[in-house]
């Protein structure tokens, strides 16, 4: 799914084994360092399959079927994007 040539993957995890934080739109899985691997629903919908741990260098490959993912929430015509001016 993703072009991860040269990336060292710690493990492969089925998405069914991960927990989904609906409020944040993030799938999580425990990391050996004590933190959690994380990948957003948006990344998965973009067919990216590498979840990273924010506390260490470990990464996992998430095994999933694109058709089985929850549909992203719709929040207006802008697709949830809000323009920001500097």
UniProtKB/Swiss-Prot annotation:
Keywords: Cytoplasm, Iron, Metal-binding, Nucleus, Oxidoreductase. Residues 9-65 form the DPH-type MB domain. Fe cation binds at residues 31, 33, 53, 56. Pathway: Protein modification; peptidyl-diphthamide biosynthesis. It comes from the Eukaryota. The DPH-type metal-binding (MB) domain can also bind zinc. However, iron is the physiological binding partner as zinc binding impairs the protein electron donor function. The keyword Membrane does not apply. One of its GO terms (biological process) is tRNA wobble base 5-methoxycarbonylmethyl-2-thiouridinylation. GO terms for cellular component: cytoplasm; nucleus. Its main location: cytoplasm. Required for the first step of diphthamide biosynthesis, a post-translational modification of histidine which occurs in elongation factor 2. DPH1 and DPH2 transfer a 3-amino-3-carboxypropyl (ACP) group from S-adenosyl-L-methionine (SAM) to a histidine residue, the reaction is assisted by a reduction system comprising KTI11/DPH3 and a NADH-dependent reductase, predominantly CBR1. Acts as an electron donor to reduce the Fe-S cluster in DPH1-DPH2 keeping the [4Fe-4S] clusters in the active and reduced state. It catalyses: [3Fe-4S](1+)-[protein] + Fe(2+)-[Dph3] = [3Fe-4S](0)-[protein] + Fe(3+)-[Dph3]; 2 [3Fe-4S](0)-[protein] + 2 Fe(2+)-[Dph3] + NADH = 2 [4Fe-4S](1+)-[protein] + 2 [Dph3] + NAD(+) + H(+). Its cofactor is Fe(2+). Belongs to the DPH3 family. Component of the 2-(3-amino-3-carboxypropyl)histidine synthase complex composed of DPH1, DPH2, DPH3 and a NADH-dependent reductase, predominantly CBR1. This is Diphthamide biosynthesis protein 3. It is found in: Cytoplasm; Nucleus. GO terms for molecular function: ferrous iron binding; iron chaperone activity; oxidoreductase activity.
